[in-house]
């Protein structure tokens, strides 16, 4: 069966100037999430991109500004698609911002956990499944996907192709994270409840969004300074059935999304570097997938289909109990707004890192 190319969109958002965003630098956000340190690392991070590009000078400026060494970044053209920056200047959906966010967040999060520069391979392709297959063939350890579209736009055949690629990736030991979308529970669709794909694939870890301050964390939904209808994606798949590993999930007609969450609200967003300038208030669930990818790459082992382990260890996450994404409200325990919650980095490291990495983190 040939590949189906879906018109996917990048899931980054920017706060409007009147929004006065509070902006995190990644090392400080990692500290707020109790990131581990001195892990063994060694994991290779795959990042999937469908458009846009990056330039070295932006990376130099960003990593110098946060006191980290540059990561090792390799571009991989899967089907002729290539790193092609500065083609959408002035477009509010300029995908260069997506590419910068993915690389900068993943690499910075990895360095905080390991003290080592990250190794990143950026896979350029017209369709996500082909990029995931290429990353699997290359032996990458984790994969971050910040592009997607409403399940209805994919249809069953393309969704099954995507899930097959994800299942093969996890069978080879790769963990795959995917943004759950930025248009609340509707996912920009015609009804109040639609989920985003590929995050709804059972072998992906769907990544939802929160509003994270120094003292509070709630579900990300639109606020003053944001466009109406913005907020974390989440809900229940109409293509993939209920998953046995999602113990404790609310009753629904299909696989629940997201599995996990972290800061995504542009009003509590990220400080990054793109087009020769520092930018603040960058957000979207696009930031959450690379944040987790950076952490999991630090664990020093091929975890593969790790979702059942995460769902069996819910105390490794900060439960988000306030807020909604339109059709669904946060509640104690897993919910279709924030999944299991936001990461407690040290607990996840104790659960998942290799014994050598755990010993290093403990100073043994």
PLM feature spans:
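Substrate-binding/charge-relay-adjacent region of secreted/lumenal peptidase catalytic domains
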Residues: 1-209, 233-284, 300-308, 344-354
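C-terminal substrate/ligand-recognition segments
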Residues: 283-297
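N-terminal low-complexity, intrinsically disordered patches enriched in charged
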Residues: 217, 293, 348-350
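Acidic/polar loop patches that form or flank catalytic/metal-binding clefts of enzymes
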Residues: 206-208, 214-219, 302-313, 317-318, ...
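Low-complexity, Gly/Ser/Thr/Pro-rich intrinsically disordered linker/tail segments
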Residues: 333, 352-364
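Short clusters of hydrophobic/aromatic residues that line enzyme substrate/ligand-binding pockets
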Residues: 198, 220, 245, 272, ...
